[in-house]
């Protein structure tokens, strides 16, 4: 049996030292469980293109490199595909304007705990000893210089006025920390009996909303210092259609149903103390459009070119939807790929395995409901800096 008391209390630990999608290339890794994110990203490429059209092009004789950043890049191939798309689109704009394209630089940024090694192994080789035009025309090669930048995007990461374009997808719903009041048993916001805020009390969800808005304010403040005049940002995060923050939409179904029930199973079986369960909270908040807009407006540095709720679809990729066991495995793997690192830090590897085994079993028993109802909505924001 795993230890009940010796593991890390995730709520009390700085998340940036710990939080990451599951690294490597195993069955439960993010690299092998991010196909749905890839499909959602592809469905939004037309919105990304619109944002890229708003970026100012430097037409000077010797322009500096065009610099793009993916914030919250994680460790799968999706970030590489997005950067490739950005570089090629901007290059086409230079060509259409009759301007020689500059060199391109891309920064992949995530928390220090991110598996950058797996990410860098996915990068195609850089075309060398040739001109930029030939680089951009080469298939299967990279036409931009790269670097990894570890650190929280809720703080400054780059020198002032050095970035042309920021991209961040499926990351801003992750909070910098679980609000302290949520894990304080003396607080009215204490999230007793739950590991997520879906269906929680008003004071609990208010604490999460305040944390999200404070984090987003810090994010915008940092980017406003780093982006060049005429630069832009394309941001995507989990969102919700309900005005009620206790209804967290797809995130609520992912973390507030079978995942929650699996924790309760461990408590009933005496494997985890109720207090230990209550000390674990998923640091995710799916905002409404109004939640998001209030922060952008208050910051005042960015013009909102587009701000919409976009239906992304299911986070699961299932080849045989009639196979309940495959649906259950996909659900459990999806949960584990994004939350497994936190769970294991909180209760240890052995109990973590037991937890996700129960998640899989419960999702298998409700496979049809999972396929029909587990749908994600995203907040999509196109912002420009002038």
From Swiss-Prot:
Catalytic activity from the UniProt record: (indol-3-yl)acetate + S-adenosyl-L-methionine = methyl (indol-3-yl)acetate + S-adenosyl-L-homocysteine
Pfam families: Methyltransf_7 (PF03492)
Keyword entries, A-Z: Magnesium, Metal-binding, Methyltransferase, S-adenosyl-L-methionine, Transferase
CC cofactor note: Binds 1 Mg(2+) ion per subunit.
Protein family: Belongs to the methyltransferase superfamily. SABATH family.
Its job: Catalyzes the methylation of the free carboxyl end of the plant hormone indole-3-acetic acid (IAA). Converts IAA to IAA methyl ester (MeIAA). Regulates IAA activities by IAA methylation. Methylation of IAA plays an important role in regulating plant development and auxin homeostasis. Required for correct leaf pattern formation. MeIAA seems to be an inactive form of IAA.
Protein name: Indole-3-acetate O-methyltransferase 1
